[in-house]
Amino acid sequence: MGILFTRMFSSVFGNKEARILVLGLDNAGKTTILYRLQMGEVVSTIPTIGFNVETVQYNNIKFQVWDLGGQTSIRPYWRCYFPNTQAVIYVVDSSDTDRIGVAKEEFHAILEEEELKGAVVLIFANKQDLPGALDDAAVTEALELHKIKSRQWAIFKTCAVKGEGLFEGLDWLSNTLKSGSG
């Protein structure tokens, strides 16, 4: 009964819950982004072995955010977390031009997953503060985002340690999910 009341209350007052996966190669800044969004500050992080999960309340949406480790050995396990996902935040280290091709391959593999067909995609072109970082247009080209025709997506330049661009991306994501597109 309590769950039914909670769902009715949420639907009347516009609250929504969404399951979000934060994916990307190792050292892209996924965990820094998660805790910047949740706590509003930068926390010291170590490479994620497995996952971190936190709730982020934003713009009348309760995001259940799953930050999955990005090491090569962990990536095959990402698919275990795909069911019931409304959105993917794909984080790219814009300064790691040596691995942008690998980031593209992993990204397009994710897009092909049947269990993520209905998920909207938010790309964070992270680490914009570092020398040689690709801007959002260059990351768009490198990831071949123009090939995405069957789902809504957006890309935002971000700097997780400074908090730049993150909430603009979350605004887009929450508005997209509220409009029922996600």
Curated annotation (Swiss-Prot):
Quote the subcellular location field of this record: Golgi apparatus
**What's in the keyword line of the UniProt record?**
ER-Golgi transport, Golgi apparatus, GTP-binding, Hydrolase, Lipoprotein, Myristate, Nucleotide-binding, Protein transport, Transport
Q: Which reaction does it catalyse?
A: GTP + H2O = GDP + phosphate + H(+)
Q: Which GO terms describe its molecular function?
A: GTP binding; GTPase activity
Q: List, alphabetically, the InterPro entries matched.
A: P-loop_NTPase (IPR027417), Small_GTP-bd (IPR005225), Small_GTPase_ARF (IPR024156), Small_GTPase_ARF/SAR (IPR006689)
* Biological process annotations from GO: protein transport; vesicle-mediated transport
Which CDD domains does the annotation name?
Arl1
Q: What Enzyme Commission number does this protein have?
A: 3.6.5.2
The record's function comment reads: GTP-binding protein involved in protein trafficking; may modulate vesicle budding and uncoating within the Golgi apparatus.
* Similarity comment: Belongs to the small GTPase superfamily. Arf family.
What is the official name of this protein in its record? Answer: ADP-ribosylation factor 1
Per the UniProt entry, what species is this protein from, by scientific name? Brassica rapa subsp. pekinensis (Chinese cabbage)
